[in-house]
Regions:
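Single conserved hydrophobic/aromatic residue that forms the stacking wall/gate
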Residues: 1-6, 10, 353
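Hydrophobic mid-bilayer segments of alpha-helices in multi-pass membrane transport proteins
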Residues: 8-19, 24-43, 53-64, 232-244, ...
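Membrane-embedded alpha-helical segments and adjacent helix-loop junctions characteristic
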Residues: 16, 20-22, 32-41, 46-130, ...
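Alpha-helical transmembrane segments and, especially, the helix-loop junctions at the ends
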Residues: 63, 101-118, 132-197, 351-352
Length: 354
């Protein structure tokens, strides 16, 4: 199985499964990962590795808490605050919009919470005669950048799980991702301020304006029904996130157990699962929210799609790598040792291609 020809077949099979899964949408990416894993196992005889159970359970716990916060009105409350901020400072919408969507995703751990703010951003920009593409473009990018910086996002949780055993803490990850993404978002916002012509100078916009093609109907975000419950849910969720960051940054805060004569510290995966499940339960109890309602929002199905995607794709990818580790090591070891920065560029380009 170490031959170059068979290795190329593996690569094509893995890429094909990913591409087809991406086209199917929803849980398609994950289930196609299962198909790819089946081919690797039953056709090519590769031994499956252990599925990423810890990563999946961490994501499920975080999504449970975020879903309960949404059911209690927490996300609606955050959107209402964002609307007030943007309408109060319309001339700075290009700078404020990405910061708002970044903060939303950073707190909730998912970019889906930023969708509700986008219509408000577009309306405020149009009313201020600012090209809507300027704040909208960078706002969407900012929400995705925040995924890599959020301590409870699927990406960060997955990375923390993959780096378990390498003496890398959650704080080590955040002290790189948070400054890097914030700086990138701010630079992108400044650049976006010069994208395209001003609306008063844009002939196409002026033409459509004269033809009355623009809808003057004002977008209004509905008031939160139970403001107290909404505020409590957001506060509980933020406190849970803060506890996770503290536990991840200071190992001495974690519980330790004597196992076979050795002191073993509780891993971050278990801590994240315990804290977030507890936060979800506290939100439901304190705000008197129906647990069924938590599964009917937009956050829960999106999060479960991420779990299935990681289940299939990560399992298939790990099996592929372990089955071809000798060949892969020989082919890239020399290059990585001489030019480690080139490996980072190669990974970046390969992800864009996929």
């Amino acid at each position: 199985y170490a031959s170059r020809g068979l290795g190329d077949v593996y690569k094509r099979q893995v890429l094909t499964a990913i591409i087809i899964g991406a086209r199917l949408g929803g849980i398609g990416l994950g289930v196609m990962g299962g198909v790819g894993l089946g081919i690797l196992t039953f056709v090519f005889g590769l031994q499956p590795t252990a599925p990423p159970i810890d990563v999946m359970l961490m994501i499920a716990a975080v999504i449970s808490a975020a879903s309960c916060m949404q059911a209690a009105g927490g996300l609606d409350y955050m959107v209402k605050l964002a609307e007030h901020l943007l309408r109060k400072n319309p001339s700075h919408v290009t700078l404020l919009s990405p910061l708002v969507t970044y903060l939303f995703t950073f707190i909730a751990g998912t970019g889906h919470v930023a969708y509700s703010v986008l219509p408000v951003i577009a309306e405020v920009a149009t009313e201020t005669k600012i090209r809507p593409e300027r704040p909208l473009g960078i706002a969407v990018i900012a929400s995705q950048q925040a995924i890599t910086a959020s301590p409870i996002s699927a990406a960060t949780v997955a990375l923390l799980g993959l780096l378990a055993g390498f003496d890398i803490t959650l704080f080590d990850i955040l002290k790189i991702t948070i400054p890097a993404t914030i700086i990138g978002v701010l630079v992108g916002a400044l650049f976006s301020m010069k994208v395209g012509k001003e609306l008063i100078e844009d002939p196409e916009y002026q033409k459509r304006l004269k033809e009355g093609l623009f809808n003057d109907k004002k977008i209004e975000i509905k008031d939160v029904k139970n403001k107290r419950s909404a505020m409590l849910s957001v506060l509980i969720f933020i406190l849970a996130t803060a506890f996770i960051v503290l536990f991840g940054s200071f190992e001495g805060m974690r519980p330790s157990f004597l196992i076979d004569g050795e002191i073993v510290t509780l891993g971050m995966s278990s801590i994240i699962e315990i804290v977030m499940l507890s936060a979800a339960a506290i939100i439901l109890i304190v705000t008197k929210t129906d647990g069924i309602k938590a599964t009917q929002g937009s956050v829960f199905p999106a999060g479960m799609q991420a779990v299935i995607a990681i289940f299939g794709i990560a399992w298939m990818g790990d099996t592929f790598l372990q089955g071809n580790m000798a060949q892969l090591t020989l082919s890239i070891e020399g290059i990585v040792r001489q030019m480690p920065w080139l490996f980072g560029i190669a990974l970046f380009l390969s992800l864009i291609h996929i």
